[in-house]
Structure formats: C-alpha cells, structure tokens
Amino acid sequence: MANEPQKSDDNGQAAEAVVTDDEIVLQDQQLKTIEDEQKSVPLVATLAPFSILCAEYDNETSAAFLSKATELSEVYGEIRYIRGDGNCFYRAILVGLIEIMLKDRARLEKFIASSRDWTRTLVELGFPDWTCTDFCDFFIEFLEKIHSGVHTEEAVYTILNDDGSANYILMFFRLITSAFLKQNSEEYAPFIDEGMTVAQYCEQEIEPMWKDADHLAINSLIKAAGTRVRIEYMDRTAAPNGGWHYDIPSDDQQIAPEITLLYRPGHYDVIYKKDSTEASEIEN
C-alpha cells in the first residue's frame, strides 16, 4: 500500500530513489497493457449471458476456475464486463448504483441529496474548490438529467462509455471514498502502512485515477455510497473471510445486497442473479 521509507546513508541524508532502465521498461509495458485493454474492451459492456464467463476457462489450464464459474452459473444469469484499467471496482459500483436509480426514482432523489451533502463535506475537509465545481457538479447534473428524463437509459450507457464524461463521473466516487476515510481517520489509521497518514494514503492510493482499490478503499466507498454489496470470489483465498463470498457491510446478513460483483485476480465485473425461482443458493 505504501512505499518503503527512504533509507539514509552514513551522513543521515535520505538516499535518492533511482529508477532503473528495467523499471522504465516495466512501466512502459504496463501502460501499453492498459492501452491495449482500452482499445479492446468498452468501459461498461452490455449485459451478457453468464455462460460466456464459463467459456473463458477449460479443464486443462484452469479447472478450478471453470468449476467455480459453473457453480456460480447456477445462481447468476448475466454478467456485465467492466474495463480493467485500475478503475474497475469504482466503475462497477457506479454502474450498479446507476442501474438501481434508473428503476427507483426515490432512490435517485435520495442519492442526489446525498451527493450534495458529500460536496459540502469535501469543501469542509479542505478539498480544492475546483474539485467540487468540476467533478461534483458534473456528477450531480448527470443525476438530475436522469431524474428529469433528459438522459434516457440508452443515453446513460452512452455517457458511461465515453472516456471523458465517464471518468469525470467516476472521479466523484474516488473523492467520496477519500472523504469518508478522512472523516473516520482514527478508525482506519491502524490499517494503513506505518509511516503514512490517512491523508497521505488517500492522496497516493485513492484520489489518483487508474489506482486499484484495496480492501480499505472497497469498504470505504460502499459505506460512503450507502449501499450493500456482495463480492463473489473465483478464488476463496482472496476473500477477507476465507469464504466464497463476502458482504459489505457485514453487520446484517438478513438484508440482501443491492449490487453483486465478481472478483477475479485483480479485477471486478458486475453479475446478476437469475430469478429466485431459478436460482439455488451457494453455500459459503
């Protein structure tokens, strides 16, 4: 999560970090990978049958993943792929919430009010004014146009697939994640690497685009957005509780999650249950 503290030389001076040629080559390769991903995968794909996921694996090279995907297909009927560009968790939550609000006007109105509250909170926490006028106002206007009917469902998905507009909207989610952590810094400080403050962590790991979300960011965004999320894991060793799925918040298992994400190593997509009459529950 944090870089190691700089080592001091014999004179007590901090040694300067040296970027090697190999590191530069690796960075270039990583950038090219992101660019290739961007060209081949939309930011937010159309709904697809869950069977497409199963078809990605075979018994010879990925038997465990094939088995898990097949098991999940008994409960989940559709998947919406999200571009893997370092923003996939934030974007998946954004898409999940927008889908809810497209069908639930009261929820949309509540989220607009909440977004205005977060804008004020950002100002109170000392975020630059331009942050609020640019990203927050843009997102709230987007929601208001959904509410007024200016943005149809088709228009919404067009916007969510436009890099410029979609990333402006996405930035709002990074900002409220950062604000939530700063508001609750005493609670979360023990989970941050030694030598780094909550503010430094947010500035380095949350606020910049293309930074993957770790467990701290995941919990914070879900709580800041006021939603309930289930994450299904293809590999149970990645789950915080060692199970096949994990609910956030985890305080009341009787309340169904609103959004379900599928986690594969380093990536999140949105998945959707079959009708209750078709699906059978997966055991932990």
Swiss-Prot record:
The active site is at D85, C88, H245, H267. CDD domains: Otubain_C65. GO terms for cellular component: plasma membrane. GO terms for molecular function: cysteine-type deubiquitinase activity; ubiquitin binding. Keywords: Hydrolase, Protease, Thiol protease, Ubl conjugation pathway. Its EC number is 3.4.19.12. Substrate binds at I176. It catalyses: Thiol-dependent hydrolysis of ester, thioester, amide, peptide and isopeptide bonds formed by the C-terminal Gly of ubiquitin (a 76-residue protein attached to proteins as an intracellular targeting signal). InterPro entries: OTU_dom (IPR003323), Otubain (IPR016615), Papain-like_cys_pep_sf (IPR038765), Peptidase_C65_otubain (IPR019400), Peptidase_C65_otubain_sub1 (IPR042468), Peptidase_C65_otubain_sub2 (IPR042467). It is an enzyme of class 3 (hydrolase). GO terms for biological process: protein deubiquitination; proteolysis. Residues 77-274 form the OTU domain. Hydrolase that can remove conjugated ubiquitin from proteins and plays an important regulatory role at the level of protein turnover by preventing degradation. Specifically cleaves 'Lys-48'-linked polyubiquitin. Belongs to the peptidase C65 family. This is Ubiquitin thioesterase otubain-like. It comes from Caenorhabditis elegans.
